[in-house]
């Protein structure tokens, strides 16, 4: 165990991961100080660089459970049973995520979650300093300078160890990279996103089905909508950066309204502020960040988006970051020194982060192109039947990622095996009537051992 005299940590970023890690470590006896470049969201209008609604899955709930804060968070969450797919023509169809209401995900607004976790971090004993933007780090001397952007005043601290929970544009990562290159690679998607809002009905109720993630798939672009506790939906349009239509061709609110009238007609009456929202909100970038190294000896380590930002299409960015928090807290308890803890943390989490980054990109293609594809729907039907027959062996991809604690890397390995089985078994078929069940059973028993936690 790390000596008591060394048990002081400074966390850069008081967002979701930073606040949760502060709770976990404060309760383990660490002296925790958080530094946040923005103001306190509890006393000022919430400002976030990225506010796509968050999908809370079992991995994230498990981390909240371990921190003892699950009940407080879940009071603000809205259940989503599945994807409500809105075709161009015809009625919306619900594609369930799991078998029943024990297998669902939850929508929560970033600001609600952040303020809740901040309150609980302070209650656990952490100290939070707002308006502190990391400017300079001297890793050898254990010295850091922060700037208050309200008046450009400097604030200097001495530190033992820094933890970077400051997001995809991490200032700590930049400082570490200047000291010794981290092997940083950022691959931006050729799509960006823009956020809009469906307000509540006049009586305060939800205007569309509240317990679903709504998707309007349209090939190379799509809309999604996630419910909020107060009756609103956060709508996100994902559109190419170039081509027609794209963010290069849809510039004005009037052009956006015409796009929605043509492609997402049933949403148009639901978004009364479409024109104004379009012109006020700039498009957000979508990218995948990979690093060769997440830590610098025992002086600094990165977690969450600061280490492995991903595209949001599997709803796992926050869940993965929360798993990081639990893993780092565990390694800090088990290791004899900080460098050993950070190295063990990186060795455990990096392969899993790479796996969910890949699966998030693949899920984008599925959501955008395949949820209305008959071949894909037949594979989904077969997947559900195989799960019914062999529930502990053939576990659907979404179940492994969202409802179990299967390491992401293992979930990816099994997913690729199962995908090959589904494609091979359904090729040339338009129903399950002539499926070779005996051959599939032999394959499943040979290639898919019983999965821990499956039932």
UniProtKB/Swiss-Prot annotation:
One of its GO terms (molecular function) is FAD binding. It catalyses: L-kynurenine + NADPH + O2 + H(+) = 3-hydroxy-L-kynurenine + NADP(+) + H2O. One of its GO terms (biological process) is quinolinate biosynthetic process. Pathway: Cofactor biosynthesis; NAD(+) biosynthesis; quinolinate from L-kynurenine: step 1/3. The keyword Amino-acid biosynthesis does not apply. Keywords: FAD, Flavoprotein, Monooxygenase, NADP, Oxidoreductase, Pyridine nucleotide biosynthesis. Its EC number is 1.14.13.9. Its cofactor is FAD. It is an enzyme of class 1 (oxidoreductase). Catalyzes the hydroxylation of L-kynurenine (L-Kyn) to form 3-hydroxy-L-kynurenine (L-3OHKyn). Required for synthesis of quinolinic acid. Belongs to the aromatic-ring hydroxylase family. KMO subfamily. HAMAP family: Kynurenine_monooxygenase. This is Kynurenine 3-monooxygenase. It comes from Stenotrophomonas maltophilia (strain K279a).
């Amino acid at each position: 165990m790390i000596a008591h005299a060394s048990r002081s940590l400074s966390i850069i970023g008081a967002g979701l991961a930073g606040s949760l890690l502060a709770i976990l470590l404060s309760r383990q006896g660490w002296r925790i100080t958080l530094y946040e470049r923005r103001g306190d969201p509890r006393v000022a209008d919430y400002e976030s660089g990225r506010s796509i609604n968050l999908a809370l899955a079992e991995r994230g709930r498990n981390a909240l459970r371990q921190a003892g804060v699950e009940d407080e968070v879940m009071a603000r969450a809205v259940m989503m049973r599945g994807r409500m797919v809105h075709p161009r023509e015809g009625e919306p169809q619900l594609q369930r995520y799991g078998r029943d209401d024990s297998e669902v995900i939850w929508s929560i607004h970033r600001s609600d979650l952040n303020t809740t976790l901040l309150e609980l971090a302070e209650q656990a004993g952490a100290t939070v300093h707002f308006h502190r933007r990391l400017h300079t780090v001297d890793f050898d001397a254990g010295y850091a300078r922060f700037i208050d952007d309200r008046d450009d005043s400097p604030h200097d601290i001495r530190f033992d160890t820094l933890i970077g929970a400051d997001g995809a544009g991490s200032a700590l990562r930049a400082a570490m990279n200047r000291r010794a290159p981290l092997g940083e690679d950022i691959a931006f998607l050729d799509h960006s996103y823009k956020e809009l809002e469906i307000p509540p009905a006049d009586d305060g109720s939800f205007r569309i089905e509240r317990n679903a993630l709504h998707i309007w798939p349209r090939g190379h672009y799509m809309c999604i909508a996630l419910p909020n506790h107060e009756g609103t939906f956060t709508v996100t349009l994902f559109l190419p950066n170039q081509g027609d239509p794209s963010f290069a061709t849809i510039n004005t609110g009037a052009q956006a309204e015409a796009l929605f009238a043509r492609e997402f007609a049933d949403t148009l009456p639901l978004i009364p502020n479409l024109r104004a929202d379009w012109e006020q909100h700039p498009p957000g970038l979508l990218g995948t960040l990979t690093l060769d190294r997440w830590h610098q000896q025992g002086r600094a380590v990165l977690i969450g988006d600061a280490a492995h930002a991903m595209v949001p299409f599997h709803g796992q960015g926050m869940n993965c970051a929360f798993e990081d928090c639990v893993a780092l807290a565990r390694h800090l308890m088990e290791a004899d020194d900080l460098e050993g803890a950070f190295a063990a943390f990186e060795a455990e989490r990096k392969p899993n982060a790479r796996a969910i980054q890949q699966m998030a990109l693949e899920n984008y293609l599925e959501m955008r192109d395949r949820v209305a594809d008959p071949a894909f729907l037949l594979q989904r039907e077969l997947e559900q039947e195989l799960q019914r027959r062999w529930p502990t062996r053939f576990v659907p991809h979404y179940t492994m990622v969202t409802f179990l604690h299967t390491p992401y890397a293992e979930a990816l390995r099994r997913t690729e095996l199962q995908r090959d089985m589904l494609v091979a078994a359904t090729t040339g078929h338009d129903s399950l009537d002539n499926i070779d069940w005996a051959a599939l059973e032999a394959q499943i028993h040979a290639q898919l051992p019983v999965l821990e936690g499956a039932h």
